[in-house]
């Protein structure tokens, strides 16, 4: 009768739906592109790739605009190498390295995507509304910061001690012009050095800086970094609680100065302890070699 026919018809129309839902998961996703992780590298000039010929930037009203380098960075910088190792394209391996950045500046960038004012000592000023957005989308975030907290006061102190006769030499060294040292670059270095004809008072002030002032500079830098790093980690977690955070260790670009050796040794211990306490990944880099410009 009619009731039985209706039941048969209902079973026949239901069968295709059952077959459709029974398709294997891999068949349903066939043809879709494989989803990539997103890696974001935070840092200063070491991260950005200063000294590498194909680093990208524009001249800004204050300092430099690093936006072109966020995805157009050098193929030799470590963001590129990590991205290549993870099989990531440029849209999924982001270089947020900002030259001259100090650790309190990175706190500002993580918390608000902007420095509230120019850092007078370093001459840097960065405002990038997309900075936080990159952090929100990241699966892995590495942090490299702290070298400039000692280097910038050192350069400023040397300038003050020499009445800024050291400015050309310091600018030459940090610009990357002395990278891959050769006889031509040795000539540039000696020319800048010969222009530093110091008076007796300038020589005395320079010696005082190198042998006593460095301890004060490095002690203050250590305080700045150890206060800032936990804030940076907390700021990242507020934006993206699921991201894996990697703390990069420190290498000393000025190994001849005992104060700097102590500074970077203490920072490595602090970063390692912080990683253990906060569930971060700590990566030691003891064998990193630096060029004459202080960059790896």
Question: Model regions: which residues?
Answer:
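Stable alpha-helical elements in mature extracytoplasmic
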Residues: 74, 78, 127, 221, ...
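A structural motif corresponding to the C-terminal end of an alpha-helix
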Residues: 81-89, 228-246, 270-284
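Second-shell loop/turn segments in exported
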Residues: 64-71, 215-222, 259-260
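Catalytic His-Asp segment of secreted/periplasmic serine-dependent ester chemistry enzymes
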Residues: 250-296
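Serine-esterase "nucleophile elbow" of acetyl-processing enzymes
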Residues: 21-99
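Oxyanion-hole/transition-state-stabilizing segment in secreted/luminal serine hydrolases
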Residues: 50-52, 105, 111-220, 252-254
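Structural recognition of the beta-strand scaffold that forms the well-ordered cores
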Residues: 38-41, 47, 93-97, 140-144, ...
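Sec-dependent signal peptide cleavage junction
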Residues: 1-6
